[in-house]
Amino acid sequence: MKMCFPCLQCFCSTSDDKVVVSKNDKGGESGKKFRLFSYHELKVACDGFSSKNKVGEGGCGAVYKGRLTDGTMVAIKVLSVELESMRGEREFISEIAALSDAQHENLVNLHGCCVEEATRCLVYDYMENNSLAYQFLGREQNRNSFDWTKRKNVLLGVAKALAYLHEEINPHIVHRDIKASNVLLDHNFNPKVADFGLARLFQEGTSHISTRVAGTLGYLSPEYAVSERLTRKSDVYSFGVL
């Protein structure tokens, strides 16, 4: 079964056939490099997707810690995709569409992807301190070491990321799943908003879109859950819960 990925048409090849450069909405190069990885390369990076390298798992797949041949530590998200039903394909395309041209210090950095038959992988920077959820729901000593200064910095970082997604980048992006497990923390506890599998793009001047309700119970805004009208305020509500 031959697959077509229109979202990858926004990239142009360089002299290295494994590296592409994303284009901005005006047709010019944005300067952000995006790499196409082979499945074998990623399998070697995380020791055959060994369970000892698994750092997380969700409804869309598992995440593994890996080391590329140049020594770069990465997080490899392996999505569960069924080619017949296309389950998981929408999430894969949404993440690439949202992050391929986005550059902000409080967004997780997407290095590239792997597309081989039914395999769909996304490669990100590895976050040494896992997620905000891990810090608060894990060991008690993690919670005790997470002082108010760190908490304030995390909240400010997430707020800056949302302001960038909602106002600065075009098309605008609504994340739809802001929650503690989707806020990753680097070695200095700087927050990085992650997991754009449910994200939706908003063209300039668009106030809302009608779409099926998706997200996490407890973080969903009531008006979105009832009306199925998605706005940027839905992310703001989730941020308030966070």
Swiss-Prot record:
GO molecular function: ATP binding; protein serine kinase activity; protein serine/threonine kinase activity
EC number(s) given by UniProt: 2.7.11.1
Active-site residues (renumbered): D177 (proton acceptor)
Enzyme type, top EC level: transferase
Record keyword Cytoplasm present: no
InterPro entries xref list: CR_Ser/Thr_kinase (IPR052059), Kinase-like_dom_sf (IPR011009), Prot_kinase_dom (IPR000719), Ser/Thr_kinase_AS (IPR008271)
Keywords: ATP-binding, Kinase, Nucleotide-binding, Serine/threonine-protein kinase, Transferase
Binding positions for ATP per the UniProt entry: V55, G56, E57, G58, G59, C60, G61, A62, V63, K77
Coiled coil: none
PROSITE patterns: PROTEIN_KINASE_DOM, PROTEIN_KINASE_ST
Inducing or repressing factors: Neither up- or down-regulated in response to zinc ion contamination and in response or to mixed metal ion contamination (cadmium, copper, lead and zinc).
Domain Protein kinase: 49-242
Catalytic activity annotation: L-seryl-[protein] + ATP = O-phospho-L-seryl-[protein] + ADP + H(+); L-threonyl-[protein] + ATP = O-phospho-L-threonyl-[protein] + ADP + H(+)
Gene3D superfamilies cross-referenced by the UniProt entry: Phosphorylase Kinase, domain 1, Transferase(Phosphotransferase) domain 1
Family listed: Belongs to the protein kinase superfamily. Ser/Thr protein kinase family.
Protein name: Putative serine/threonine-protein kinase
Annotated organism of origin: Helianthus annuus (Common sunflower)
